[in-house]
Swiss-Prot record:
Keywords, sorted A to Z: DNA-directed RNA polymerase, Nucleus, Transcription, Zinc
Function of the protein: DNA-dependent RNA polymerase catalyzes the transcription of DNA into RNA using the four ribonucleoside triphosphates as substrates. Specific core component of RNA polymerase III which synthesizes small RNAs, such as 5S rRNA and tRNAs.
Name of a matching Pfam family: HTH_9
Organism: Schizosaccharomyces pombe (strain 972 / ATCC 24843)
Protein name: DNA-directed RNA polymerase III subunit rpc3
InterPro entries in UniProt: POLR3C_WHD, RNA_pol_III_RPC82-rel_HTH, RNA_pol_III_Rpc82_C, RPC3, WH-like_DNA-bd_sf
Chain positions covered by the region annotation Disordered: 220-244
Similarity-based family: Belongs to the RNA polymerase beta chain family.
Gene for this chain: rpc82
Length: 591
């Protein structure tokens, strides 16, 4: 963890939790695991205040704990989860994503949980003044939203072991399995191997239990729900749709899934990070191909979302067929008009031949497959159009998807490892282009293509003079985008007899950029804090109950102007921090 990430986390905790929590978090971030007596020495705070700060941070899973036996007594250590602290920046984005994916009421639930950290389902009902039995329309809507949030894993059910670091959980399981095998007469190597396998299997089972579809949900007789509606059948092979209502996630005709009132839930930041990255990928599809194809790709990614968190499928490659996409593609999205007909083509004869060949190929594939249900003419035409959009995605140089077979009018694969690497590469190139210009990105692409290249050879390939590119190369080397390797041709290592090879190391370049992003975001929040401190009296006056909402009546014109200027300044700084966070999302987290 870099010093800039530590500095940013300290600022965020101070901004949202106060000085006491910031002092405790800072000590844990800078010194690692500490006990309460150690924290008292590091922070000079009394024990009760430290305990209150730890409780507040543990409520948001920013601090975890583990109890161990030392000198025949129990000792509790605390450690920070710095990524959870950083996720404070994304709370607003999480609320917006849920409002787009589900509805505004579900977003209100996520907003409430983002302020509380975690809460019982019963507390959520009480906070919004809704009845848990769903006896009125608003309460039924709250029940439905909570069920969908839990079912689609936007909310995770909190277990006591979630407050223990994963490494300590594995250590506890390892000690337990070693105690069981004390009496076994086998070699230590074999015993350790078997224990490692047992620990890995048990951790996998615990994770599978966390991601179970029914985790945090209970069955309720259908008759107990006021004004029950008829259950609608879900399409075969479809993933849970965001527009699906509560009746679409029934287990059977006699019962319905409702949230467990005693379950503690919190926001699943991993799932929401995936949604943000999918939106970023869709943005690049729109830039490279077009709006309609980006809508098709967005739906492809949304269909694959449930599989990303599946325990049974650990492969980074996921597949789907054109027919599966057709059955689940919304009817209100028009993708047919985006495919250019022959009369609009520049070379109508060649385009007509190519389109007819593609349609004939799809017709042959449709005849070869034995589908259980007949496809009408509209669905068949829709499948052909979607297949054309998928072909565009596969033919793109960025390889958003790839074709792997002909099953179901075409089988397509999405490699999320490739997508992560590709997204980082194009985002980094975009950053270099904005910082140093088109010449820099041109040189970077040549160096990436050649691996290691000497400056003279680079000048010949780029059709530039050496003195013109040397400044650009040096500037990129200063930020870590390029590195220089010396290869002497003689033992005296004379500069005239030495090759100087330029090369690019992506991992190191991304890591240095990530540190710089943390540094810049921290400076933005420091500027925001200073701006508020300079106008502290004005802010305190504007936040009075009798003035809030009536600023024009109680504040003088120069105060209103100063307040408006401050809010505009805050908006600009927070917007810039949000844009930088989008880059952090790409370079730090995997899909």
């Amino acid at each position: 963890m870099s010093q800039y990430a530590v500095e940013l986390c300290e600022i965020l905790v101070e901004e949202f939790f106060g000085d006491c929590c910031s002092a405790v978090a800072s000590a844990l971030l800078r010194h690692g695991r500490l006990t309460i007596p150690m924290l008292q020495k590091r922070t000079s705070l009394p024990g009760p205040k430290i305990r209150q700060a730890l409780v507040s941070l543990m409520q948001h899973h920013m601090v975890l704990y583990v109890t161990v036996i030392e000198n025949v007594r129990e000792v509790t250590y605390y450690e920070t989860q710095w990524k959870e602290i950083y996720n404070i920046l994304r709370k607003g984005k999480d609320v917006y994503l849920i409002s787009q994916k589900l509805n505004q009421e579900a977003a209100s639930v996520v907003k409430y949980l983002s302020t509380q950290g975690r809460a019982r389902v019963l507390e959520v009902f009480n906070a919004f003044d809704k009845k848990v039995d769903g006896s009125d329309e608003e309460s039924r809507m709250m029940q439905k939203n909570l069920t969908e949030l839990i079912y689609q894993k936007f909310l995770l059910v909190v277990q006591p072991r979630h407050l223990i670091p994963v490494g300590d959980q594995e250590m506890q399981l390892r000690i337990k399995h070693l105690d069981r095998r004390k009496s076994e007469n086998v070699s230590e190597i074999k015993k350790n191997r078997e224990v490692d396998d047992s620990v890995a299997l048990e951790m996998l089972e615990l994770r599978a239990a966390d991601m179970s579809e029914l985790q945090g949900l209970t069955r309720k007789p259908k008759e107990s729900i006021p004004h029950p509606t008829k259950r609608r059948k879900r399409a075969v092979g479809s993933a849970p749709s965001v527009s699906t209502d509560l009746n679409n996630i029934l287990d059977d005709d006699n019962s319905i899934l409702v949230p467990d009132l005693s379950a503690h839930v919190r926001i699943n930041s991993g799932k929401l990070s995936v949604l943000s990255k999918n939106a970023r990928l869709t943005h690049w599809v729109e830039r490279r191909i077009g709006k309609s194809t980006s809508l098709v790709y967005s739906h492809v990614l949304s269909m694959l979302e449930p599989r990303l968190f599946s325990i049974s499928n650990q492969s980074p490659v996921f597949t789907l067929t054109t027919m599966e996409l057709t059955r689940n593609f919304p009817n209100d999205i028009d993708v047919e008009s985006s495919i250019v007909d022959k009369q609009y083509s520049v070379n109508s004869a060649s385009n007509e031949l190519r389109v007819m060949e593609k349609l004939n190929e799809l017709d042959e594939l449709a005849e070869e497959d034995n589908y259980e249900e007949s496809v009408d003419e509209n669905a068949n035409r829709k499948s052909k159009v979607l297949a054309q959009h998928l072909e565009l995605l596969a033919d793109c140089s960025l390889k958003f998807i790839s074709k792997i077979g002909n099953r179901g009018m075409g089988e397509w694969a999405v490699n999320f490892t490739h997508l992560t690497d590709m997204l980082r590469a194009i985002e980094y190139e975009n950053f270099i282009e904005q910082k140093f210009g088109e010449r820099a990105i041109r040189l970077l692409r040549i160096i990436k293509d050649k691996g290691k290249i000497e400056e003279k050879q680079l000048a010949n390939i780029a059709l530039l003079r050496q003195r013109d590119l040397r400044t650009v190369l040096q500037a990129m080397a200063e930020i870590g985008a390029l590195e220089l390797q010396e290869v002497p041709r003689s033992s005296d290592r004379a500069p005239s007899k030495t090759f100087f090879l330029w090369f690019h190391r992506p991992d190191r370049a991304y890591s240095l950029l990530l540190d710089e992003l943390y540094h810049v975001i921290a400076r933005l929040y420091m500027r925001l804090r200073d701006a508020r401190a300079q106008r502290a009296q004005l802010i305190e006056k504007a936040e009075r109950i009798d003035i809030k909402g009536n600023e024009e009546q109680y504040l003088q014109k120069f105060e209103q102007a100063e307040l408006k200027k401050l809010y505009s300044y805050e908006e600009k700084l927070l917007l810039q921090a949000s844009r930088l966070d989008d880059m952090v999302l790409v370079f730090r987290d995997n899909l």
